[in-house]
Swiss-Prot record:
Keywords: Coiled coil, Methyltransferase, S-adenosyl-L-methionine, Transferase, Virulence. It holds the Pfam family Dimerisation. Belongs to the class I-like SAM-binding methyltransferase superfamily. Cation-independent O-methyltransferase family. COMT subfamily. One of its GO terms (biological process) is symbiont-mediated suppression of host immune response. Its EC number is 2.1.1.-. Induction: Expression is positively regulated by the brlA and abaA transcription factors. InterPro entries: COMT-like (IPR016461), O_MeTrfase_dom (IPR001077), Plant_O-MeTrfase_dimerisation (IPR012967), SAM-dependent_MTases_sf (IPR029063), WH-like_DNA-bd_sf (IPR036388), WH_DNA-bd_sf (IPR036390). S-adenosyl-L-methionine binds at residues 287, 319-321. Residues 20-85 form a coiled coil. This is O-methyltransferase gliM. Pathway: Mycotoxin biosynthesis. Gene3D superfamilies: Vaccinia Virus protein VP39, Winged helix-like DNA-binding domain superfamily/Winged helix DNA-binding domain. GO terms for molecular function: O-methyltransferase activity; protein dimerization activity.
Length: 431
């Protein structure tokens, strides 16, 4: 007779006390009952309203303590479910995960969220006609997305509606997340097809170069094919959506009147957001010549996007941060270092260390994602693979940043978690 649930049996072949099995099973049953009670309480309308206000409001930063509690809890539950989910089920997410991305893009392209926002809850018979999708197929698409927490379904009247996640996909939503549902499940999906070739021993080309059949880097290729605007628009929208947390979740008042030099500042949106949020700050921006030529009118012309803070932008500097960096006491660098391998990052960190002006506020603030285990760390892990296939770059762990910083003469003073943003602010101080 096969051993039952509480018989002496383990996968390792080592016998365990029957009472230990009982204790584990009882713990799981108690946990299940407790989770059901909490779930029932959370689903109460007044609790939902409170959570949406404190944790999920699209236009306000979440409560710090509540958000951290939620993240820690999600990570704990994720770690537990990995121990309980059948092995083949773990593999199936890898087999079929691409379908989530393609399903999301299909409904975004058809503007399903927009039609629901305009007309309220609808059955698929009506919604499908408004979106140009076969109603039966739309039901299949939405069934998957509802199970993923995107859109809501009411079985009482067989209607679908927007929820807090799907509302972010509306084309007129200020965050413009719908752009990400296009670029990554399409262009970046195509690039990922070449991942197996790109990681082989002796291969120096990126997956993007292999997929597109070019020796140009990704940015040069996109510019040549007149596709760079879509890429820049998508990443720019993401930067806007995440900007507020970056301006408030670091003690920028510590810098006082010391000017900031934003290295590799790109469009200038990050520097502009800091100056708008903190009237006492002044700054300059450094980037390559083509970028500086592009953004100069935005700061210097009367109708430029950043003309309102243009007088507090002291210089727009042409330069190459892999070679030389102008002196400053305070530097910032956002989403640049993940484009580079460790040796290049070390060179850049050393360049900044050599140039920094000693003062009581001297620091180098690196805005990058930090890899970590658990469900809450999945975005940096996605980013790590994106960097790998597009530019041979990588995201890094906290230990990676400590090690590289110390090799370049920096002490990792503190890491500031940023609400509603994927990167952290890594505060390096000169050693």
């Amino acid at each position: 007779m096969a051993p039952g649930l509480l018989e002496n049996n383990t996968l390792s072949g080592t016998a365990a006390p029957r009472t230990e099995f009982k204790a584990i099973v009882n713990d799981l049953r108690e946990l299940q009952a407790h989770v059901q009670r909490v779930q029932s309480a959370i689903e109460a309308p007044e609790v939902q309203s409170w959570l949406n206000e404190q944790l999920h409001h699209p236009d306000q930063l979440p409560d710090k303590e509540l958000e951290q509690l939620a993240l820690d809890l999600v990570d704990s539950m994720d770690k537990l479910q990995l121990q309980l989910v059948p092995s083949v089920s773990l593999l199936t997410d890898g087999f079929f995960g691409y379908l989530n991305s393609k399903t999301l893009w299909t409904v975004v392209e058809a503007q399903v969220a927009d039609r629901l926002a305009e007309n309220g809850p609808q059955p698929v018979s009506t919604l499908g006609l408004r979106c140009g999708i076969q109603p039966e197929r739309l039901a299949q698409l939405l069934d998957t997305l509802v199970s993923n927490g995107i859109f809501a379904y009411n079985p009482a009247d067989d209607t679908y509606s927007n929820n807090r996640a799907s509302l972010l996909l509306c084309h007129d939503h200020w965050t413009q997340w719908h752009l990400w549902a296009d670029l990554y499940p399409n262009e970046f999906f195509d690039v990922s097809r070449a991942m197996p070739q790109a990681v082989r021993l002796g291969e120096s080309r990126t997956a993007a170069q292999i997929a597109y059949g070019t020796d140009l880097d990704l940015f040069e290729y996109l510019a040549k094919e007149q596709k760079l605007a879509k890429f820049q628009k998508t990443l720019g929208a993401g930067a806007v959506a995440q900007a507020r947390g970056l301006t408030v979740d670091y003690p920028w008042e510590e810098i006082g009147s010391e000017p900031i030099l934003d290295i590799g500042g790109g469009s200038g949106a990050f520097l502009a957001s800091l100056l708008r949020a903190h009237p006492h700050l002044r700054g300059s921006l450094m980037d390559i010549q083509s970028v500086i030529e592009l953004i100069t009118p935005e700061f210097r012309e009367p109708h430029g996007r950043f003309s309102d803070i243009g007088s507090r932008v002291q210089q727009l500097v042409v330069g190459d941060f892999t070679k030389q960096i102008p002196p400053s006491a305070v530097y910032t660098m956002k989403w640049c270092l993940h484009d580079w391998v460790d040796d290049d990052v070390l060179t850049i960190l050393k360049n900044v260390r050599r140039s920094i002006v000693p003062s009581s506020v001297s620091r180098f603030l690196v805005v990058e994602s930090i890899k970590s285990p658990g469900r809450s760390g999945r975005l940096p892990r996605y980013g790590d693979l994106i960097m790998m296939i597009t530019c041979n770059g990588k995201e890094r762990s906290l230990e990676d940043w400590k090690r590289l910083g110390e090799l370049a003469g920096w002490k990792l003073y503190q890491v500031h978690r940023v609400r509603r943003a994927w990167p952290c602010i890594i505060d390096f101080r000169p050693m």
